[in-house]
């Protein structure tokens, strides 16, 4: 089939020659039945959802329980990001660095071009223009995803500013990131489709130097919604390195004091460390309030006033469902309850509602994520551990009015945090920016699921970016240091290291966490205002229990002391682990971080 015979190619709603040429090239390669430019309208969304219901991909949920919401159950082989099939293809291997899978770009293009050949036969090729961050930003970052998945089109409408407005912003010659996606499941004439088409062969490939993403074989989440981690972190981190800004795996929170002063905080935590819960915090201390700017990604650059400003480039939440409930995260539950949600791989109740592990209620019968009958005796989880809700951010009851500000919000503090049973205190303040970079660069978190390796072993996850770096980790650390060097030191955010997960000898959590974490954040903002004390320790400045506002908190004071304790012998045991990590980073490790390591060693004696 030539381009002349592919319906929809000749009626494109754009004069952008670069875009048109690319769409034609992809259509000739992948051989779809038709080409459709997504416009992002309500009518299109409803039409595609109805099509997905008809195809068996979506089940419409009970509108009284979940208004205008749907459930999708994926193929059991296609349930999560696949780090082993994720590649960074730079011209030189060293530019991808030791934390990434690398292949020569020409070789990868050859392999994937063969896979794409005819891969959309029997399907529709959708052209999905989108903008990361506000459309009226000074330097809007645009992308176009080509996909053969309706699930992707409807999800991209929730997760990004997608459709006609983004296409108009592109104009006739604007730059955009090319994001090509195919599930790799062509249909022969008369062949019956399956509810969740995908391919056993999977590649999620990034070409940072040409700002391109090629994904094949997966219809799921971050592998297929290419604005998510692929663009907003892997490609954007490379763009940020070249252009002098930061693209980070961070929530953005607005904390408001009783005096009505607002502080914006960015925080990087690895998965399963409570990022979304903190982003939607409900403070437990009198007079303090919190609002949400973002729960996953922060793009940060310096404003004209010399302060660091952050933007959430996303338009929705793509949250992990299990563990989310009315006590751990009431604001997430209210956001979901407003409707317009696509759930993936959660369980379904007999009355057409959804359920997952950790949710209130004690169902006696469900249809599980594999589509099978489930009872409490089944002996396996009803919802997949990585099951998701995809919901518009505009429905969040605590959404900060500044969330859509094209200038972003000025950041007062950056938090790094992981899940550590021992060693790391509840909160530590870095001595200065470079020391803060050292803290982020050595961030470790205990594995939480047996599948990821031995439970309890500490995996280094620098700035919580290990799976998301678009270039060499050593160059990334150097970039962070340079960002600080090129700034007015007095205007840089303070950096803190937090650990909500420290345990006592008997294995219980020493700190209650969740809304009580507002007490820890209060100390951080009081440090910014020079109103709170802390004691200097070998690892940084740590509060005593007396420095924290513990009024009305029902916790044993000895537990708080233990949560804040700095034990030199535990830190001395940490040193060889940090050294091993730095050796892995290799020759590109900045001298500044070696200096910080030597200074820590010396302070520990």
From Swiss-Prot:
It is an enzyme of class 4 (lyase). Its EC number is 4.1.1.32. Changing residue 75 to Q: Significantly reduced carboxykinase activity. The affinity for PEP and OAA decreases 9- and 2-fold compared to the wild-type, respectively. Substrate binds at residues 81, 220-222, 271, 386-388. It catalyses: oxaloacetate + GTP = phosphoenolpyruvate + GDP + CO2. Keywords: Cytoplasm, Decarboxylase, Gluconeogenesis, GTP-binding, Lyase, Manganese, Metal-binding, Nucleotide-binding. Optimum pH is between 7 and 7.4. It is found in: Cytoplasm. Mn(2+) binds at residues 229, 249, 296. Pfam families: PEPCK_GTP, PEPCK_N. SUPFAM superfamilies: PEP carboxykinase N-terminal domain, PEP carboxykinase-like. Inhibited by oxalate and by alpha-ketoglutarate. In vitro, the enzyme is stimulated by reducing agents such as dithiothreitol (DTT), reduced glutathione and 2-mercaptoethanol. The keyword Membrane does not apply. NCBIfam families: PRK04210.1. Monomer. Involved in the gluconeogenesis, in growth on fatty acids and is important for initiation of infection in the macrophages. Catalyzes the GTP-dependent conversion of oxaloacetate (OAA) to phosphoenolpyruvate (PEP), the rate-limiting step in the metabolic pathway that produces glucose from lactate and other precursors derived from the citric acid cycle. It can also use IDP or ADP, but with a lower activity. This is Phosphoenolpyruvate carboxykinase [GTP]. It comes from Mycolicibacterium smegmatis (Mycobacterium smegmatis). The lineage of its organism: Bacteria, Bacillati, Actinomycetota, Actinomycetes, Mycobacteriales.
